[in-house]
């Protein structure tokens, strides 16, 4: 084992053997690199000679007079004033292209470029072109004459070399627009977006303003169904649009008959005491247009008037509707009592039922909204059984106690005037055939 180990050590160690055949001779430090260095030197010399030959050939391309003229012009300009950014490498042209013959300026520019490329290799092409253009404009006719003559010679030579030559400019790629076009397009897009946003806002105002708009406008716009307390939105025009829309929609409701508002989303219980205490913002005279026209209360031909008036007050989202209902109820009571006093001949006709029995509204047929609520029995609507007519006068002057004025409409008894289950069994109420001027003394504004 010891002999094997010694043999292996001798084999592994580079200097352990004395046999010159096993160990290579130590080489001088320049032995491996000398051939490569010689090759590199030869290649550099060849490249230098090639560059010199190319420069000589390029110099031979221009006559001596052109080179002298270029030197004469360039010697008078300090090229150290031109900024020298990093040169950008241009893309190589894959397809050969026959160039146009150079004009006088191109002859001057190319000859000057070749001379300046050796002296100032870091000049940027754009800055060089601008400077050459400035110098060309400063030259007089005598300085330009050699370049003009050379350009004419090149044109004749080009005509001989390419007799069928036709100038075909390359088409500009439409992928990238110019900076000016990009700015214009962005401005146009911004203007269109602002116009669209303005139209969208106005469209929302229109949909909110008119009750005769789409039935799903309240759902689609995402507005709450609470009372229209200002300021619910930052825009004050929206409130004006709402009031105008209601005013316009009242005529359409009277003429059309069936309103487009879903009463399932309207609840009088949503009225707060703050809204009741701020009722001075609503004009009392504004709600006179919602009162039904002259006619018999129980007559079927005038049911549409009551239906449209109640549909519109329901569309007012609880706040104004409570005010209009209180005003209407009190005025109807006052009118009926006035008729009782004036028409003494028909006293027995009015004593058959209480003076407030005309508030039963038994013939109010709302089949469109009847499915939203269960059928209501008659006693919930018979106001004469629950409350005397004097409650309208005792609570009409108190804005904060309008809930007590509507004590017949407690939270569990808010049917929103749906169809009554037994309309045939209830006697139709009687009201005067002609409406008199409303009495405003019975309901004072808070």
Curated annotation (Swiss-Prot):
GO cellular component terms, A-Z: cytoplasm; nucleus
DNA-binding span(s): 98-166
Region Transactivation domain (TAC): start-end pairs: 337-446
Tissue: First expressed at stages 13/14 at the lateral edges of the neural plate, in the neural crest forming region. By stage 22, neural crest cells migrate in the cranial region and strong expression is seen in the crest cells that populate the branchial arches as well as those migrating in the frontonasal region. Also strongly expressed in the trunk neural crest. Expression in the otic vesicle begins around stage 25 and persists until at least stage 40.
Phenotype upon loss of function: Loss of neural crest precursors. Also an increase in apoptosis and a decrease in cell proliferation in the neural fold.
Keyword DNA-binding: yes
Polar residues bias locations: 213-226, 426-446
Protein name: Transcription factor Sox-10
Designated gene of the protein: sox10
